[in-house]
Amino acid sequence: MTVPTTIRLPSKQTVILEGDDLRLRIDDNAPLPVLRPDEVLVRTMAVAINPCDYKMHERFPSPGAVDGCDFSGVILAIGAGVPSLGVSFQIGDRVCGAVHGSNPIRHDSGSFAEYIASEAEFTLKIPDSMSFEEAAALGGTGLATLGMALFRTLELPGTPEEPAQKPLTVLVHGGSSSVGTMAMQLLRLVGHIPITTCSPRNFALAKEYGAEEIFDYHEPDCGQKIKAYTRNTLRYVLDPFTDAKSIALCCGAMGRAGGRYACLEMYPDYLVEKRTLRVGFVMGPALLGHRLELDYGYERAADPEMRQFGIRWYRSIQWLLSKGQLKPHPLRVLPGRFDAILQGIEMLKSKSVSGEKLVVSIGM
């Protein structure tokens, strides 16, 4: 491990972890993460809050596990094996990314902490024009999830470096969400045409992030309107919610020939019984290629091929960032460091956030 001699690391840090009562709490005496050879140690400057930050620890309780996924910060130390990985980092680099929070296999891997160990091949350099808060809001979790959803589950052609020659229409359900705005940007950048659904108050936001056409998902005939707009030919759907309402809407919009359906939540059995649909459930941490020791269909075996895809995808994302072609969701920065993180999680649980990404500054 390379650590500059001018930096003295503390022995303890403040984190948010799962307590013995299975509730999230602040711990001011947690150890720093153990840095592995292929990782960089990051001093956290900002974190973003996602629904998975409460869903993971509620679904898969593991007392002692640090919560949180998306982060930005500054590199303080570099693992001994990083130079051989084909990535170039230096002490002091501004970076962002995502880690597997509430990980039952590795309790110290969450981002709601003052120090984070991040795999170098899945860490992104922040452009000079981007703040730490904006970088955290880019959503490393969302970027990982969308890479798998768009190119592995939907099997869309094209890459950021070589966009598709023949554009395809893709329905992004919930286009005013943070995953929706990023999905629409990425679809445009790889040569495709996003259409979306959201509340009318967020139509302008969805249009700003690339929507070709927008439909009000409150309308009972929304699916039929999408089907009419696409002339009964829609073949690609991204459904971040995968609940009864979203499935009914998206299936109602799908063309008569069927197609591919990417779910960001576990789907019900009846969805795969539709013979014209090829359905896939995507989990962001799976992009790392590690074994996911979870339950209820969320578990994954180690997948070296997926890891190689993920490394290539992150290089494409870094290329887009270097060209200034990705922008984060509109921010709402909460003051209060770790107390604010707990507040933000409750705000997401109560569904009181719309059209904004919750971000908390951690750096002093």
Curated annotation (Swiss-Prot):
* MF terms (GO), sorted A to Z: nucleotide binding; oxidoreductase activity, acting on NAD(P)H
The broad enzyme category this protein falls into is oxidoreductase
Q: What keywords were assigned to this record?
A: NADP, Nucleotide-binding, Oxidoreductase
For the ligand (substrate), the binding residues are T141, G142, L143, A144, T145, L146, G147, M148, G284, P285, A286, L287, L288
E.C. code = 1.-.-.-
Which residues participate in NADP(+) binding? Answer: 52-55, 176-179, 199-202, 217, 264-265, 353-354
Q: State which pathway it belongs to.
A: Mycotoxin biosynthesis
Pfam family name, one: ADH_zinc_N
InterPro entries documented for this protein? ADH-like_C, ADH-like_N, GroES-like_sf, NAD(P)-bd_dom_sf, PKS_ER, Trans-enoyl_RdTase-like
- Explain the purpose of this protein: Trans-enoyl reductase; part of the gene cluster that mediates the biosynthesis of a family of the mycotoxins cytochalasins E and K. The hybrid PKS-NRPS synthetase ccsA and the enoyl reductase ccsC are responsible for fusion of phenylalanine with an octaketide backbone and subsequent release of the stable tetramic acid precursor. The polyketide synthase module (PKS) of the PKS-NRPS ccsA is responsible for the synthesis of the octaketide backbone. The downstream nonribosomal peptide synthetase (NRPS) amidates the carboxyl end of the octaketide with a phenylalanine.
* Subunit: Monomer.
Similarity comment text for this entry: Belongs to the zinc-containing alcohol dehydrogenase family.
Protein name (record): Trans-enoyl reductase ccsC
- To which species is this protein native? Aspergillus clavatus (strain ATCC 1007 / CBS 513.65 / DSM 816 / NCTC 3887 / NRRL 1 / QM 1276 / 107)
